[in-house]
């Protein structure tokens, strides 16, 4: 029997998650409903499944209203990220949308440096400059306005995604993983629903 430590499990889980994220934009492009509504139903189904699990495991006991407000923050960030990202997928190439939204770690490092005084080494500066340099080369190579807009949307989505990652990291010191997942899915529905209303109005 193979014994896996927590670090190995974390790396494997992250790798699997990255592969699934890689498939997500393709499925969004194939969806027959609007981009935001596609994301809304994704979050709604996740909320429903997590709610059933939470009830079965008594996960909602001792939660205060203040806790729910705090836990809403990652959800708003995540829902805003997905709303903008889904819009970008329909306005630029799937490859560009996936590439630009994954510049989030650059923003995470920069924001963490200013907010939490996390140290950045020279390798980060070099890698970050290479990454952003590549992004700008791709951006300004575009000839079509719609494609350029889609690329910008995915870059803004990355900023919201970094907000989600930072808030989850910070709040994981106080709250259970389940609570972070459930309320991220629940409150993530809000910006996605608002986004779908905007799409109806167009």
Model-derived segments and spans:
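Glycine-/small-residue-enriched transmembrane alpha-helix faces in small-molecule transporters
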Residues: 1-40, 76, 84, 145-170, ...
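Specific transmembrane alpha-helical segments of multi-pass solute transporters/efflux pumps
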Residues: 57-95, 100-101, 137
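Specific alpha-helical transmembrane segments that line the substrate/conduction pathway
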Residues: 37, 43-47, 86-117, 157
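Loop-to-transmembrane alpha-helix entry segments
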Residues: 65, 98-101, 117-137, 144-153
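C-terminal transmembrane-helix exit sites in multi-pass transporters
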Residues: 52-58, 104-126, 142
